[in-house]
């Protein structure tokens, strides 16, 4: 799949065909920042892996005022347009660790082997919380507006992602995961099932 100007025009810039909106991303940023605040996680560094057009950047930085933001993006077009760091979450390397890592709607584009390597890398890069989402087989069938979503062959079930993430992360709900070593008491009904 070509993540070029035509792709982003169709799925992000054209309001009639866009997969999301700025208002949805502002709400998502409120959710993310509210979760890290609730669990008492100070956030100094954010990695947005697959940041796309950067719709989370401003609303997150408005709420997490002491944080710096690193946008990692695979698309040459977006890196040239927005100045993101070019790379893939599967192979991205840095000495920095991030308090908050975001990887949303990225891994469904990778093969299972690539996605496993990406999840291992997310675990290496994250020292606090992960906000994670991927289009699953169940979402394609039951939830998404297929006229506004690109067709991705080989979608995996949600159980695949939960199983792969579980070795390094604990789910706390609403797409939020915390590293297993983070000292956090999760009450039984507060935690994701």
Positions of PLM-derived features:
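A conserved beta-strand element that flanks and buttresses the S-adenosyl-L-methionine
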Residues: 102
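Class I (Rossmann-like) S-adenosyl-L-methionine-dependent methyltransferase catalytic domain
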Residues: 1-96, 110-117, 121-124, 128-193
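Short catalytic micro-motifs in class I SAM-dependent methyltransferases
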Residues: 105-109
